[in-house]
């Protein structure tokens, strides 16, 4: 630790350390040059042109046909979604025919029947207005004036 402090204070020691750094940098540059010569590349990697053997052969490129035949399904593949079903019991469209507003009335009646089956009678029971008029409970049950005085009796003026 003391040697480092002395080196920074002594100009002769500082010049020696600068020479050491310069020598190290020069060694690194030489090693980099030798490595680039071994690889067959000269100069910076930015200026290098790509080699011809880096390009993929034309026979290996996959180009789709114009007819998009890849979209056709082979017989062994199954579709993701089956649209045709045999059962018509799920939803009966004949009840909801488009014959004017009578179909809307039919739907409304069906909804009312379903609500009654489920036990909801929201449209038949009127709202109780007394429920809306309940005052909120007070947070502090005592009077504010009682807390301010030290007496046990509370007097409101």
Curated annotation (Swiss-Prot):
The keyword Chaperone does not apply. Residues 1-103 are annotated as: Disordered. Disulfide bonds: none annotated. The modification N-acetylmethionine is found at residue 1. The keyword Acetylation applies. It comes from the Eukaryota. Residues 38-52 have a biased composition (Polar residues). Belongs to the FAM219 family. This is Protein FAM219A.
């Amino acid at each position: 630790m003391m040697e480092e402090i002395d080196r920074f204070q002594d100009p002769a020691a500082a010049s020696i350390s600068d020479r050491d750094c310069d020598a190290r940098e020069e060694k690194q540059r030489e090693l980099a040059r030798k490595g680039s010569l071994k690889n067959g590349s000269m100069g910076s990697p930015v200026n290098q042109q790509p080699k011809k053997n880096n390009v993929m052969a034309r026979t290996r490129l996959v180009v789709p046909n114009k007819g998009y035949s890849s979209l056709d399904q082979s017989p062994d593949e199954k579709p993701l979604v089956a649209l045709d079903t045999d059962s018509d019991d799920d939803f009966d469209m004949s009840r909801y025919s488009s014959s004017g507003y009578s179909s809307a009335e039919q739907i409304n009646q069906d909804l009312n029947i379903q609500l009654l089956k489920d036990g909801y009678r929201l449209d038949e029971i009127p709202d109780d207005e007394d429920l809306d008029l309940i005052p909120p409970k007070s947070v502090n049950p005592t009077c504010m004036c009682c807390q301010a005085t030290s007496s046990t009796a509370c007097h409101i003026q």
